């Protein structure tokens, strides 16, 4: 380490961590610490040669030696001859180290115990054996000589003395760290490496291979990093500078000390005692014990509690060792390097500031004065109001009137940053211009509350002052609230009115029958507004008015258009504040929260930021004013209980009684009864809610003609809910419907519902039941917040180094985007999915593939989305970060539009962190619970047919059918789909159709809305013949392989195949089958699985499409569906689900081999005759039959899919589709919109590593994990040299694993498992290139993203320039002195330039 005084050059590009050799430790040290004393208890001066010695570590006071002979600056650098202290600043006590010479070597515990044990790997010994040697339990042979002993053999005392008697001093055996050190010194790295390289190809067993390649890697790491193995055992121990382990006097003569001092004291005491014992040549057993104690005390100093019991202090808590100092949330990394406290900041409670403009915040005068103090002093001085800083300080303290004027000048156009914790995404920290206010609370603009997730129930916010010019510039240009209108998560406006504002706008945009002024016609908008102002026209009256609109086309040309519109008077108030260029239709509707959001979005896209901001402000003022005037309030009479409620509940009670009776008679089981009861009550609850909403939603009113007319209700509660201002249907249901079913704390549902609502009031029992749910809610919220925060932290960590680094990587690859379909319905149109992305291939017209509609490389904006929609395009290829070709970072073409700005993403945008925040921020809104679905609820909802919603044309896809005798088509393919298109050819619906369904329409048929197009039996799985012919039974014998079943209802008898376990031993190997002799004379065998019910008789003629047998589907029992946050975490951690789906490993024909106990042998044979077999447990339901052809990656046995299988069998695009859709499903359920891009960014990071399957001509081995980018570069190099490239498979790593496997050890160490990461890095001598954001924050530099990217670029160019200059200077052979001075001035110039922000 360089001391700050030695003016070192702090320009560096990478950091390396290695083992410290004894010489290096000596070179750091300024002297040996010989005594355990700290300071003299009388004089409080440090003891000489002790842990705080001034001679070693430097003076305690600035420029003053210990004895006081030399004081003041002029003696700087003098070493006092009396006390030996160098006269210099006391700061050197922070970086001068000392050392302790150990009397006996000591093994470093990290390299011993941190798994895998490095010492163990190098010596090829088990940890247990090494520990026995180290802690003096047994001897180890280090030099066998000519004896029968072997090197590395362990001997206990008895064996050792026997061997001594037998061989004398022919051999050497030692114990303790000394022995281990000798053995490590003896290792010949090159020889061992060569031996292993020869041995590896010959080994057969996987475990041996793994161990050998691990050992080889470690040996090579030692060889390449110039670390010596024996350095893992220390002879000399460095001592931390004393100011980093301070001794602080408390009042009452006591001291607070760092735990490290205690730990060092123990080491020094034991070391000195050992030295003395060795001088006295004490008995072996005593010395041995002392050496063991020394080893233990050094262990405790380095990592307390890693081995044995942790050493505790006086108060019984374990002492904090050096390792504890750096790890964990309170450790050096997370507490001090990644999270620092910030000066020039304050915090206070927030209150609403409804009069502010969007870019302003109200700052209390007192706070402002404190925050801007230095600036205020400066202004007072420069205006001559104060002569000295001291005078200015006095004026500010007295708060004289001039001070406020100066403060106002200082604050003008000097933005401040407001931050609300928890800062879950970048909008939690925004810049505002301060407005000075009285009082002590910060005023916040209501529209930014959504972004901060703030409310005014006592929330606090922090204020920070950007000091430098660059910081102010950045705050204004990038962080100002007016520049953050769109949410980075989905590109929709986040500056959206909510609550009162929505209520006000909704109220004035609603029409009411027979309002004052109904039917009036106005020539101009102003005329109508005057009428409203003079109370001649009510805001809810329906009127006609002449409106002039201005249309602006793409080139900016304006055209005016006047027309008469039917509207509501209040909507003109909104039209009055709308910017020029917007159409009247956009505000001529009921202003619910959704519509207001649409309005602001459209305003942003049409007329730009500035207008939108002003419009949003005006909307807010209007909304607040009108909400006040509307007089909407809430009263108990607004909670109207539906008259039908009583009747609905009576019906339900009767149904429940019936089920209870059935249960008592034994017709249904207890589980079924419970499920059915719960089912009835949840249906009833919905019925009551519907009746209530229908009742609330309309009013009867007398119109102008005196007749009764129905209109939308003006009930206050309904208005609040309908507008989206406050309250949901579910909450109103509890007020005026029925409370319904409650859950117990364990998540199970209590079957007696609460039939009352809050208006009627609850009985004691009902109240007690509902307390359950309320408590669970609070406990859940606390858990959820912690879990969600941890998910965000893992996401940020895995994606932090992903930055846009270039404009275009030139790749042709991408993802195929299709509309998102669920339950046959299109939930997300293609246009919504591809908006803001770049096309990867040309998009052609549907009817003409030669004609290009959109060329490749086009950024799809709103205009193009319309084009896609109008041309009925169903799928298009777009660029994606997953397929981006750049090694570090991604290119802006693959990323597309920056969602928060609405244009193509800038170079330097840190998209990784943005993605992590966008996914993590809504985490708190997701549920934590696992859904128990089962019983009546799920079995009732089994589909058995498909009915289309809208009319259109049916298209069959992947469909293989046979014509049945009854004229229907029967499907005999697995992944058949029916798509429905409208008259323009746009896809409207899409359905998956199961194997064995009857299709009731033909391809290209026109179908009507509501028509059933396919049906099937949901409870059995059919075996269908594709050919006509004669069926013959093979090995189907009653009593052996089958049994005759008689159907009670119909009296028909049929064969049922017996399961293997139910057959007699002689019939176990028989394979029951139906052999079909087709009319063409071919023979087709259909093997029958267990429990098949045969539907044909022996020798019967069958038609194509006939069902030969049916396999009953096991009715799905209660399945737990993991939902919400845990599901998202599972997906990103790439966990293998339990009982996951089994997929076909290759394309080929299926056959079943000999069964083993409990397993079926499943075989696939491909065209080349290659065979893949696997054993599948018998209880798994296999979807394919003998002789069927399956495609690679096709699902054979149902279950949740395993992402690793998808990657291996179907490739990375299929994997991306799967993860994106699964994650989106969870968020969609909660109504949260996140752009797919963000999820893709995380997937890219999960796919960074590859596993090597064949090393080719490289020095990698099978099973190595390497970065994808490195392998690409390596292969390019190998191919250029005509060598064999490396073969590899892409790996999918969970986010935690991926974060720890990152190239940067600083980033990994600051994430988790600090000890393990640092140990591994030190042994291999790892170099951190400081590419990511985190590493740069840790070393205290600007991050290489955003404005920092330019800084780093400039820095690199300067460094290169310097090197060139150096070469030139060498060439001119200039004298060294001028050279040095040049560089000093050069550095200064560069520093100045940076400070002025010229870069």
Curated annotation (Swiss-Prot):
The keyword Lipid metabolism does not apply. Zn(2+) 2 binds at residues 809, 884, 891, 894. It catalyses: RNA(n) + a ribonucleoside 5'-triphosphate = RNA(n+1) + diphosphate. Its cofactor is Mg(2+); Zn(2+). Signal peptide: none annotated. CDD domains: RNAP_beta'_C, RNAP_beta'_N. One of its GO terms (molecular function) is DNA binding. GO terms for biological process: DNA-templated transcription. Coiled coil: none annotated. Binds 1 Mg(2+) ion per subunit. Binds 2 Zn(2+) ions per subunit. GO terms for cellular component: DNA-directed RNA polymerase complex. Keywords: DNA-directed RNA polymerase, Magnesium, Metal-binding, Nucleotidyltransferase, Transcription, Transferase, Zinc. Zn(2+) 1 binds at residues 65, 67, 80, 83. Its EC number is 2.7.7.6. Mg(2+) binds at residues 455, 457, 459. PANTHER family: DNA-DIRECTED RNA POLYMERASE, DNA-DIRECTED RNA POLYMERASE SUBUNIT BETA. Belongs to the RNA polymerase beta' chain family. DNA-dependent RNA polymerase catalyzes the transcription of DNA into RNA using the four ribonucleoside triphosphates as substrates. The RNAP catalytic core consists of 2 alpha, 1 beta, 1 beta' and 1 omega subunit. When a sigma factor is associated with the core the holoenzyme is formed, which can initiate transcription. This is DNA-directed RNA polymerase subunit beta'. It comes from Psychrobacter cryohalolentis (strain ATCC BAA-1226 / DSM 17306 / VKM B-2378 / K5). The gene is rpoC.
């Amino acid at each position: 380490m360089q001391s700050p005084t030695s003016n070192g050059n702090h320009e560096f590009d990478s950091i390396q961590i290695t083992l410290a050799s004894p010489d290096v430790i000596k070179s750091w040290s300024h002297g040996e610490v010989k005594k355990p004393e700290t300071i003299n208890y009388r004089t409080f001066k440090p003891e000489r040669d002790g842990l705080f010695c001034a001679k070693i570590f430097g003076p305690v006071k600035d420029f003053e030696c210990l004895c006081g002979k030399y004081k003041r600056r002029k003696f700087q650098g003098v070493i006092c001859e009396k006390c030996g202290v160098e006269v210099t600043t006391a700061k050197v006590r922070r970086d001068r180290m000392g050392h302790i010479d150990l009397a006996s070597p000591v093994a470093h515990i990290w390299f011993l115990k941190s798994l895998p044990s490095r010492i163990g790997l190098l010596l090829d010994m088990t940890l247990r054996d090494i520990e026995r040697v180290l802690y003096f339990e047994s001897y180890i042979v280090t030099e066998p000589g000519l004896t029968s002993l072997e090197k590395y053999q362990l001997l206990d005392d008895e064996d050792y003395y026997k061997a001594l008697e037998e061989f004398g001093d022919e051999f050497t055996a030692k114990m303790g760290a000394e022995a281990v050190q000798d053995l490590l010194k003896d290792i010949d790295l090159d020889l061992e490496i060569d031996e292993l390289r020869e041995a590896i190809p010959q080994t057969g067993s996987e475990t041996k291979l793994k161990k050998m390649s691990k050992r080889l890697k470690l040996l090579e790491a030692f060889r390449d990093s110039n670390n010596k193995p024996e350095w893992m055992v220390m002879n000399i121990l460095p001592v931390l500078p004393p100011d980093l382990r301070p001794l602080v006097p408390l009042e009452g003569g006591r001291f607070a000390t760092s735990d490290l001092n205690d730990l060092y004291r123990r080491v020094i005491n034991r070391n000195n005692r050992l030295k003395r014992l060795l001088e006295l040549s004490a008995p072996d057993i005593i010395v041995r014990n002392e050496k063991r104690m020394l080893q233990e005390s050094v262990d405790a100093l380095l990592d307390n509690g890693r081995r044995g019991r942790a050493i505790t202090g006086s108060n019984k808590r374990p002492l904090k060792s050096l390792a504890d100092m750096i790890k964990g949330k309170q450790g050096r990394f997370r507490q001090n390097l990644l999270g620092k406290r910030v000066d020039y900041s304050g915090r206070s409670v927030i209150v609403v500031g409804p009069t502010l403009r969007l870019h302003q915040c109200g700052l209390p005068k007192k706070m402002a004065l404190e925050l801007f103090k230095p600036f205020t002093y400066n202004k007072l001085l420069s205006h001559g109001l104060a002569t000295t800083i001291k005078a200015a300080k006095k004026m500010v303290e007295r708060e004289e009137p001039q001070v406020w004027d100066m403060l106002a000048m200082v604050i003008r156009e000097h933005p401040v940053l407001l931050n609300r914790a928890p800062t879950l995404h970048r909008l939690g920290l925004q810049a505002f211009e301060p407005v000075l206010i009285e009082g002590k609370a910060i005023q916040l603009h209501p529209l930014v509350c959504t972004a901060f997730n703030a409310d005014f129930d006592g929330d606090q916010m922090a204020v920070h002052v950007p000091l430098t010019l660059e910081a102010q510039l950045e705050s204004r240009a990038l962080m100002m609230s007016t520049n953050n209108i769109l949410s980075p998560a989905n590109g929709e406006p986040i500056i959206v009115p909510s609550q009162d504002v929505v209520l006000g706008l909704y109220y004035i945009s609603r029409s009411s029958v027979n309002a004052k002024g109904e039917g009036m016609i106005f020539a101009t908008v102003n005329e109508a507004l005057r009428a409203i102002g003079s109370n001649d026209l009510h805001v809810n009256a329906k009127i006609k008015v002449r409106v002039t609109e201005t249309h602006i086309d793409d080139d900016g040309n304006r055209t005016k258009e006047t027309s008469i519109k039917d509207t509501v008077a209040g909507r003109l108030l909104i039209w009055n504040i709308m910017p020029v260029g917007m159409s009247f239709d956009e505000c001529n509707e009921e202003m619910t929260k959704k519509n207001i959001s649409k309005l602001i979005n459209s305003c942003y896209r049409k007329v730009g930021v500035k207008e939108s901001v002003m419009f949003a402000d005006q909307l807010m003022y209007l909304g607040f004013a009108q909400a006040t005037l509307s007089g909407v309030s809430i009263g108990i009479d607004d909670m109207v209980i539906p008259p039908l409620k009583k009747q609905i509940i009576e019906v339900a009670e009767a149904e429940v009684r019936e089920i209870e009776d059935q249960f008592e008679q034994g017709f249904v089981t207890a589980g079924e009864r419970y499920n059915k009861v719960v089912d009835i009550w949840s249906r009833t609850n919905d019925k009551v809610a519907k009746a209530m909403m229908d009742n609330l939603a309309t009013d009867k009113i007398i119109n102008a003609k005196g007749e009764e007319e129905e209109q939308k209700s003006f009930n206050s509660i309904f208005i609040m809910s309908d507008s989206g201002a406050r309250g949901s249907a579910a909450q109103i249901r509890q007020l005026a419907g029925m409370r319904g079913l409650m859950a117990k704390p364990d998540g199970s549902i209590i079957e007696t519902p609460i039939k009352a609502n809050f208006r009627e009031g609850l009985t004691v029992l009902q109240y007690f039941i509902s307390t359950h749910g309320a408590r669970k809610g609070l406990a859940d919220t606390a858990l959820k917040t912690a879990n969600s925060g941890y998910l965000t932290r893992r996401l940020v960590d895995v994606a932090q180094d992903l930055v846009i680094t270039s404009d275009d990587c030139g790749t042709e690859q991408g993802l195929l985007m299709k509309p998102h379909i669920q339950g046959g319905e299109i939930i997300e149109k293609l246009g919504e999915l591809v908006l803001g992305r770049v096309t990867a291939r040309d998009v052609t017209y549907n009817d003409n593939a030669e004609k290009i509609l959109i060329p490749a490389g086009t950024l799809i904006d709103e205009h193009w989305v319309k084009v896609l929609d109008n041309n009925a395009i169903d799928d298009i290829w777009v660029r994606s970060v997953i397929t981006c070709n750049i090694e570090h970072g991604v290119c802006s073409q693959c990323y597309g539009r920056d969602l928060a700005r609405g244009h193509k993403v800038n170079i330097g945008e840190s998209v990784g962190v943005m993605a992590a925040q966008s996914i993590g921020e809504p985490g708190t809104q997701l549920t934590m619970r696992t859904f128990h679905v089962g019983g009546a609820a799920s079995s009732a909802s089994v589909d058995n047919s498909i009915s289309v919603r809208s009319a259109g044309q049916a298209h069959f896809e992947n469909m293989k059918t046979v014509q049945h005798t009854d004229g229907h088509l029967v499907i005999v393919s697995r992944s058949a789909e029916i798509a429905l298109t409208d008259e323009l050819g746009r896809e409207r619906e899409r359905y998956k159709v199961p194997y064995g369904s009857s299709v009731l329409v033909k391809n290209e048929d026109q179908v009507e809305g509501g028509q059933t197009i396919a049906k099937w039996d949901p409870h059995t799985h059919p075996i269908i013949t594709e050919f006509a012919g004669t069926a013959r039974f093979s090995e189907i014998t009653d009593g052996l392989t089958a049994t005759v079943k008689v159907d009670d209802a119909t009296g028909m008898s049929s064969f049922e195949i017996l399961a293997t376990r139910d057959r007699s031993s002689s019939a176990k190997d028989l394979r029951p089958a139906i052999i079909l002799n087709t009319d063409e004379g071919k023979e087709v065998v259909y093997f029958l699985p267990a429990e098949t019910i045969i539907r044909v008789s022996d020798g019967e003629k069958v038609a194509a499409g006939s069902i030969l047998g049916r396999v009953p589907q096991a009715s799905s029992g209660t399945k737990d569906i993991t939902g919400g946050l845990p599901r998202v975490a599972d997906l990103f951690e790439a966990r293998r689900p339990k009982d996951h789906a089994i997929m076909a490993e290759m394309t080929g024909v299926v056959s079943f081999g000999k069964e083993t106990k409990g397993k079926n042998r499943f075989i696939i044979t491909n065209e080349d005759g290659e065979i893949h077999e696997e054993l599948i447990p018998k209880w798994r339901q296999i979807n394919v039959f003998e002789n069927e052809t399956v495609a690679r990656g096709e699902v054979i046995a149902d279950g949740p899919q395993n992402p690793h299988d998808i990657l291996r069998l179907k490739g990375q695009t299929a994997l991306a589709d799967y993860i994106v859709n699964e994650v989106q499903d969870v968020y969609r359920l909660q109504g949260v919109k996140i752009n797919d891009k963000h999820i893709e960014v995380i997937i890219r990071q999960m796919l960074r590593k590859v596993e090597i399957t064949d090393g080719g001509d490289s020095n990698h081995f099978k099973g190595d994990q390497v970065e994808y980018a490195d392998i690409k570069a390596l292969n390019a190099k190998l191919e250029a040299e005509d060598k064999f490239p490396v073969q590899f498979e892409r790996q999918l790593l969970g986010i935690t694993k991926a974060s720890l496997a990152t190239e940067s050890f600083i980033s990994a160490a600051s994430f988790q498992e600090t000890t393990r990461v640092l140990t591994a890095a030190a042994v291999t001598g790892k170099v951190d290139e400081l590419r990511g954001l985190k590493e740069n924050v840790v070393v205290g530099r600007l991050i290489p993203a955003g404005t920092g990217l330019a800084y780093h670029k400039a820095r690199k160019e300067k460094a290169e320039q310097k090197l060139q200059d150096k070469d030139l200077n060498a060439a001119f052979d200039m004298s060294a002195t001028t050279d040095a001075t040049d560089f000093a001035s050069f550095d200064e110039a560069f520093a100045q330039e940076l400070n002025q922000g010229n870069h």
